[in-house]
Amino acid sequence: TAAVHPGENTLTVQVYRFCSGSWLEDQDFWRMSGLFRSVELFTKPELHLEDVFVKQSFAEDFSSATVTFDCKVSGAGTVSVVFNGQEQSAEVGEPAEYDSGVVFGKGEADPDVEEDVQDVSFTFTVEHPALWSAEQPNLYEAEIALLNEGALVERTGMKVGLRKFELKDRQMLLNGKRIVFKGVNRHEWSCRTGRTVSREEMLWDVKNLKAHNVNAVRTSHYPDDPYFLQLCDEYGLYVIGETNLETHGTWQKLGADGSDEWTLPGARPEWRENVLARAEAMLERDKNHPAILIWSCGNESHGGKTLWEMSEYFRNTDPSRLVHYEGIFWNREYP
């Protein structure tokens, strides 16, 4: 990059309090500006793990689990995955197919990456899996390593919770057993530092929720800090991950004159990309957290085609979770 030079460099960040997207952020909280969470600037090697999506399926009696790591890798080299005492590897760079549960193929080029992004999947079988739940938040460890001619280039560690969540006969089932949410809405707020919440305060929240027999949290009304979700994985809290969308101020005129001209996002094409991008950003960041059982389209943003498209995006991209939306009323255009 031409943006930095040898020696010391100055990085200047300009933060805007409001932007056009602020019309989609009408949540009920104090309006503050600034950086509330950690910000990272990093470089990546030519051989790089761009993404991983952990997918699961189970025997009917949960006596075994099939766990697949769908990886996207840029560059050429060796990809190695270690999970549950098993190791699998594959060479990336040329389309091929491998035995032992490894399938490899060339994906579409990512416009944000110079190299083509290639898809490679690793499938493992776990006998008698230790399942994840709020009562027993069992976690497995996985490690993905990228090597160039045997030399380690990059290593990624992650924790994997094995669980199956479904809606069956009008009941929510986790690992085949009915569960009931005893939950709360949670805003990110500190009595001491406002919108910036420390890790110690997040841990305090989680421990106190557990101590008071709360088993579920809705991240009202935006995706929470990744560290909070990590704590929910480790301590055992069910999470409704909510998209950063609330526009109740734009449709309050409906009660006065019945007009729909102010309502956002509705079916307005100029807002579609912005709204769906928020849903995608949340899902792609948080999709491997076992604690998240439900994706939420947002809060109090009326109805319309765009919200329906968001719900369909969640269902089609991640059928392992349910989809929620709290919109005050039932939009009868979409039964």
Language model regions located:
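Aromatic- and acidic-residue-enriched carbohydrate-binding clefts of CAZyme catalytic domains
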Residues: K182-H187, R195, E242-K287
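Short Asp/Glu-rich motifs
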Residues: C191, F228-L229, T250-Q252, E333-Y334
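Active-site neighborhood of glycoside hydrolase catalytic domains
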Residues: E234, T263-P335
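Active-site-proximal loop/turn and secondary-structure-junction residues that shape catalytic pockets
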Residues: P223-D224, L245-T247, E300-S301, F329
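Short aromatic-enriched loop/helix-cap "lid" or pocket-rim segments at secondary-structure transitions
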Residues: L24-E25, W251-L254, L307-M310, P335
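Secreted/periplasmic carbohydrate-active enzymes, especially glycoside hydrolases
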Residues: T1-V239, R278, L293-I294, E300, ...
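Beta-propeller blade termini and top-face loops
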Residues: F29, N244-L245, T250, Y313, ...
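Hydrophobic residues in well-ordered beta-strands that form the structural core
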Residues: V239-G241, Y325
